[in-house]
């Protein structure tokens, strides 16, 4: 179904249509992912922190700043997210011995087990895009990178 049919409307031009289409599709995909995460009692930002900790496990422990730089949502309150995950026993948060102002964060075995059990969530997300060929996915990623570079340039000015 086209975006016009989906929203029952028209657009000023193709740029407007592209922006609305991108936003609408992103919200649909995020909702699907949210539903999958909800079954595991974890929010998207919490999942993102755990994913970062797992991915950089060889460099552990990590600082809050290191995690924040890699978050999908750059406005996330990483300290609060880390506190909640610490309360659930999914990570540890300790004072950094070299700099007491810094906190050192590391994923626990319980956190790793949770991520392992969430493999179905990750597979579900992969299937949301499997109607695209490898070439189309590559093109999509190239176009999204190009759009993001434009927004990065505006933030630098």
Model-found features: residue ranges?
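C-terminal regulatory/oligomerization modules of transcriptional regulators
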Residues: 1-10, 135-157
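N-terminal leader segment of winged-helix/HTH proteins
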Residues: 1-40, 88-90
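Charged, amphipathic alpha-helical coiled-coil/dimerization segments
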Residues: 5, 83-138
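Pre-recognition alpha-helix immediately N-terminal to the DNA-recognition helix
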Residues: 21, 48-52, 113
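Short, locally clustered residues in the helix-turn-helix/winged-helix DNA-binding domain
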Residues: 23, 51-58, 119, 145
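The N-cap/first-turn positions of alpha helices
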Residues: 26, 43-49, 111, 136
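N-terminal helix-turn-helix DNA-binding core of bacterial DNA-binding proteins
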Residues: 31-74
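Short, hydrophobic-biased segments on the C-terminal half of alpha helices
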Residues: 64, 82-83
């Amino acid at each position: 179904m086209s975006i016009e049919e989906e929203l029952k409307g028209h657009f000023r031009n193709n740029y407007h249509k592209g922006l609305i289409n991108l936003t609408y599709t992103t919200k649909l995909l995020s909702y699907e992912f949210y539903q999958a995460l909800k079954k595991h009692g974890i929010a998207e930002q919490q999942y993102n922190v755990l994913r970062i900790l797992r991915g950089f496990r060889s460099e552990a422990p990590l600082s809050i700043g290191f995690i924040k730089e890699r978050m999908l949502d750059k406005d996330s309150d990483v300290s609060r997210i880390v506190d909640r995950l610490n309360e659930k026993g999914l990570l540890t948060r300790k004072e950094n011995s070299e700099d007491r102002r810094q906190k050192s964060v590391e994923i626990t075995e319980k956190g790793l087990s949770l991520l392992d059990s969430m493999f179905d969530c990750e597979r579900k997300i992969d299937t949301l895009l499997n109607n695209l060929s490898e070439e189309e996915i590559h093109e999509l990623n190239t176009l999204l990178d190009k759009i993001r570079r434009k927004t990065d340039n505006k933030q630098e000015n």
